[in-house]
């Protein structure tokens, strides 16, 4: 059969892409947002609304054909995937999906079970969850991953984090907060490293296996003990441009996959819940429904479980 791999597909690259202004192209995605400064949701909301309305207008003006922003949901991407399968002359689609790619693979198997070949979904997203439930789960996952990293670090050599798990977590949080106030000097004299950049790198490395965590040890050791963020500077230069999916693509796809649920009162309560269940990362995940309402292109169907009846076994 034909092979496919997807980590974050749809609306990018040599397909017909969503195109946004370069300034907005570097705007924060789902989990790369300003470091938490505990601004109440009610104060943040008008800024979110203005930002995403402007961004949508910009993306709509730069994206051809007109109307594409209403057709980049996962169901549409799955249908495109089946067209690619047919054009390549394959009876079945063999597919490896990670992250968002698991969501796409699940929808493909639901829509085209007879065309589904060998499919592996690594770390599957649950399609029956609402956008808020998904974001809450992600925030909790990062919160646990941060604790796992600190435990791993303290059990090994050359760990800059002292005390127990809570103390180690707090040292990272304090570093981020301090760098937000006064960016930390790096090997590039014109580019000290901000708390937001440190937080983003920490989040990216928490997604990786323990084999990559020694790099985080090195970066934190320099920053905490030598007030030198050179390693963070290198990591930011290397990874941020690659990992920060164009925000227009991200929200263009995500918002069409979920209908907007709740109102300002609901979202303020959810914001408080997020800060309770994920005190260090919760604020990065608040306001998803408000964002999509402001973006102006959202789904209409409630989330549902997918069963892919008739498809070959999926791993």
PLM segments and residue spans:
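Alpha/beta-hydrolase fold active-site neighborhood
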Residues: 167-311
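A catalytic-pocket lid/entrance helix-loop region that shapes and gates access to the active site
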Residues: 5, 13-37, 107-171, 205, ...
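Loop/turn elements at helix/coil->beta-strand transitions in domains of secreted/extracellular proteins
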Residues: 2-5, 46, 53-54, 90-93, ...
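Mobile, glycine-rich extracellular loop/lid and propeptide segments
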Residues: 1, 102, 123-124
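Conserved acidic catalytic loop of the alpha/beta-hydrolase fold
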Residues: 64-67, 78-92
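Cap/lid segment of the alpha/beta-hydrolase catalytic domain
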Residues: 2-75
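Glycine-rich nucleophile elbow surrounding the catalytic serine of serine-hydrolase chemistry
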Residues: 79, 97-109
